[in-house]
């Protein structure tokens, strides 16, 4: 799927931005496959434009974010002030998008004001709230998940994703676990699942799992066991092929 995205873009752009993600938060790691994406693409496809593969590693300090931004910016200009301004504008836009997500908006809602058609989202007068837990690239890529989110929304279901849950709540929930989760996604997924146990408005949970994903294999199992033992919330696991959809 990632190869497909690149093939679609390669003749339309001057650069491909494929950052080498190592860590996006202190003391945590991103899945190693993200660190290998630039090399995978560079050595498997021909005729590519220049690839910007700056490492993003915030494991020790968030200050490394500005270092990465400066490294990228110097490819285009020597104006340090201009790069810093662009970095601050990007941060502001990012924080605004995070706030929209926490208010229950989905990424597709950012680019359109068109209202979805109302569906039959009530059972005995109660609105259905369904939590969808999984990697964001699975949740928000309609090709991979076969338009799962659209199908839910078009039927009037209120969809709740990991991004809509406050980071402090996630950290509080995962702090109760016997061992710290050092994968960024694992912490968020598990914390979100545990948070659902406290909510009285959740009617069901869908765990969108990648076939062959090591993190998913144990986080999903832990979450499912916990929820089935301590609640009567319906829990379903949808396993998809992240390579082909």
Task: Please tell me what each predicted stretch does.
Residues 1-245:
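An N-terminal assembly and electron-transfer interface module characteristic of large anaerobic redox
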């Amino acid at each position: 799927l990632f190869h497909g995205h690149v093939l679609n873009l390669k003749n339309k752009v001057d650069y491909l931005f494929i950052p080498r993600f190592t860590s996006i938060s202190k003391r945590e790691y991103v899945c190693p496959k993200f660190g290998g994406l630039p090399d995978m693409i560079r050595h498997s496809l021909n005729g590519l434009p220049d690839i910007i593969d700056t490492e993003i590693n915030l494991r020790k300090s968030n200050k490394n974010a500005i270092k990465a931004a400066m490294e990228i910016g110097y490819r285009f200009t020597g104006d340090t002030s201009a790069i810093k301004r662009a970095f601050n504008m990007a941060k502001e836009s990012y924080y605004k998008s995070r706030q929209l997500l926490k208010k229950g908006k989905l990424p597709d809602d950012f680019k359109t004001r068109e209202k979805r058609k109302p569906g039959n989202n009530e059972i005995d007068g109660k609105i259905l709230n369904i939590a969808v837990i999984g990697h964001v690239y699975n949740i928000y890529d309609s090709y991979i998940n076969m338009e799962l989110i659209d199908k839910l929304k078009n039927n009037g279901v209120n969809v709740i994703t990991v991004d809509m849950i406050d980071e402090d709540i996630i950290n509080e929930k995962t702090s109760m676990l016997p061992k710290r989760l050092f994968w960024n996604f694992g912490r968020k997924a598990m914390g979100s699942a545990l948070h659902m146990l406290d909510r009285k408005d959740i009617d069901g949970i869908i765990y969108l799992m990648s076939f062959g994903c090591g993190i998913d294999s144990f986080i999903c199992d832990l979450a499912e066991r916990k929820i089935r033992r301590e609640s009567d919330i319906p829990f379903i696991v949808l396993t998809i092929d992240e390579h082909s959809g």
